[in-house]
Amino acid sequence: MLCHQCQETIKGTGCTQMGVCGKKDNTANLQDVLIYTLKGIAYVSNKTGITNNEIDSHIVDSLFATITNVNFDDKYIIERIKKGLKLKNDLRTKCGCTPEKCGELPDFVTWDAKNDLEILEKAKSKEISLEIPENEDMRSLRKITLYGIKGLCAYLHHANVLGYNDEEIQKFIKKALIDISDDLKSPEELTALVLETGKYVVDTMALLDKANTESYGNPEITEVNIGVKNNHGILISGHDLKDLEQLLNQTKGTGIDVYTHSEMLPAHYYPAFKKYDNFVGNYGGSWYLQKTEFDSFNGPIVMTTNCLVPPADEYKNRVYVTGVVGYPDVKTIPVNEDGTKDFSKVIEHAKLCKPPKELETGKIVGGFAHNQVLALADKVIDAVKSGAIKKFVVMAGCDGRHKTREYYTDFAKKLPKDAVILTAGCAKYRYNKLDLGDIGGIPRILDAGQCNDCYSLAVIALKLKEAFGLNDVNELPIVYNIAWYEQKAVAVLLALLYLGIQNIHLGPTLPDFISPNVAKLLVEKFKLNGITTVNEDMNLLLE
């Protein structure tokens, strides 16, 4: 095992025996086998020009399952490997993809396994390693692309669930899997692939934005209760809005309240969910606090996506996972063939539990996605022209458990009163309960939504560029101080780079999988920087 795909990797250099996230050595290796298998499917599909929805969804959902804090279940990973091998072999049989027809075939195409034991043996082999080739810059470029398409697949999965897809994005995922396995690719070609990944991340986020807004309406300014009521409750975490919709429909009239947790908070901003009387508020804060918060919630918890922390015994029997999320010996809500899910077991469980324990009281405000902010465009533009707003500070991204992330709370507190924070993702929990006031009625914290809603922040920036008649988005009074944690944040970073955004400050640390030479390239081409101290960065960003 060598895993350094997240920001919290041990000593910043990689987890080698067990992940900080809780992922075991054998699970990490099996996930590498799964990715290896996906490369084989992509290769055969690309060579033959044959694909279908089953192949596409298998690749997308499998890559999503390998993201940090999504799936810890070896049985689940092995079953996906088996299915992948069958899809690949059926495709080869159907089209006769032999060396004579398709040329010399790589091992990930020809490899097969008759049983679980052979899969476990493959997990020990060198072929599956992401540490190939020996050149660290080539490895770095390959990993940046791989982690970027993992994040892309998370967003595409959610769009697919709502019935939205894009053939060109699906083609690119396969192309990227093949290209990062091609030893003949030059550093220049792999660098171009990194930026091409950013292009398709933008397309995917746009697709998901369309899926969400056409399904549930455009987010609008909303006050969200952070206290509790006295009824039985169900807590839903993750990002899947369709799961939430089904849960709300099934709990209607049961007397059970539904609370969001962490990245599900922005669901409250969508008009479609405001009709549910039992959709009562948000419970707790960021994902890494769940061991305390899940315990005190008292009722069942539904994990629709990441971030799942290995559940403690005190509440493990109340955790339900669904979709691509997995953990050994935790109850699963399966998806039916028509895409529906039956949450009746969760509902009956909730009736046996005490109401949630109150953690805090009050309200937080959000719903500032692109449609809502652009509706306020005249007010925003006037505030900038008058000097009432001097800077917009994009502080989007991820939260995490390390103490170094207190930097973002301190940074938000010390911003001058003429600065407005634009945020999306769970990074918001470092400052979204601070009372920073407003500027002429414009709140100084504008929350666009989930991490994928960084797309909204990009749209806002591009529209403001037009409104001010500027040639370059970097001429706007917008600076970027972004926190990353896992692969969706990598995808967002690549999207911003593709859009030409420069002078991004990324923290709390730069990714270990970026080699010194590749880091130098990013600094020279995009002026990408790390963070230092609050005061130093404040002076640098607000100069």
UniProtKB/Swiss-Prot annotation:
NADP among keywords: no
List of residues binding hybrid [4Fe-2O-2S] cluster: 239, 263, 307, 398, 426, 451, 486, 488
Residues where [4Fe-4S] cluster binds: 3, 6, 15, 21
UniProt GO BP: response to hydrogen peroxide
Cofactor section: [4Fe-4S] cluster; hybrid [4Fe-2O-2S] cluster
Main location: cytoplasm
PANTHER family linked to this entry: HYDROXYLAMINE REDUCTASE
HAMAP family named in the record: Hydroxylam_reduct
Family per similarity comment: Belongs to the HCP family.
Name this polypeptide is given: Hydroxylamine reductase
Lineage per the UniProt record: Archaea, Methanobacteriati, Methanobacteriota, Methanomada group, Methanococci
Gene field: hcp
